[in-house]
């Protein structure tokens, strides 16, 4: 209770849920944080950050021209255990679940439209497939 924060467990659950959906393999204890106000000495939750290794983004570990389904099975979570679902379920069992996505499969083309000029078609296609797979796996995170 050093920070005085009452809802850190829910915050941690949200991080674990988001990381599971995004396949974020780079969560570590240095990017689970709180912010301290120097003037008042009070703490608040930090925005969730560092998703750079999500959706199989590491092209060295997950080359673009191979089977994404084997990659999805192979990617490991951090920092508490190597299985995303197990890690997420442990956190949500202890602290509850707050994460709910407000988009559906039919929204994906529009979400990707602004990325056409930034990424090669093969990269966008793979990200699209990964998102759809994760939507199926974690359908409970989506509001209908």
Indicate where each model-derived feature is located:
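Anionic ligand-binding catalytic core segments
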Residues: 1-14, 18-24, 29, 33-144
């Amino acid at each position: 209770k050093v920070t005085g924060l009452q809802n850190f467990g829910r915050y941690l659950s949200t991080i674990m849920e988001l990381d599971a959906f995004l396949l974020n393999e780079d969560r570590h204890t240095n990017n689970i944080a709180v912010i301290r106000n120097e003037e008042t000495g009070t703490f608040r939750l930090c925005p969730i950050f560092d998703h750079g290794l999500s959706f199989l983004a590491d092209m060295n570990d997950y080359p673009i021209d191979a089977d994404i389904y084997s990659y999805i099975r192979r990617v490991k979570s951090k920092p508490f255990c190597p299985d995303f679902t197990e890690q997420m379920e442990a956190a949500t069992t202890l602290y509850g679940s707050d994460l709910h996505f407000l988009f559906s499969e039919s929204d994906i083309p529009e979400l990707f439209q602004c990325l056409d000029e930034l990424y090669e078609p093969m990269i966008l296609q793979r990200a699209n497939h990964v998102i759809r797979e994760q939507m199926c796996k974690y359908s409970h995170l989506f509001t209908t």
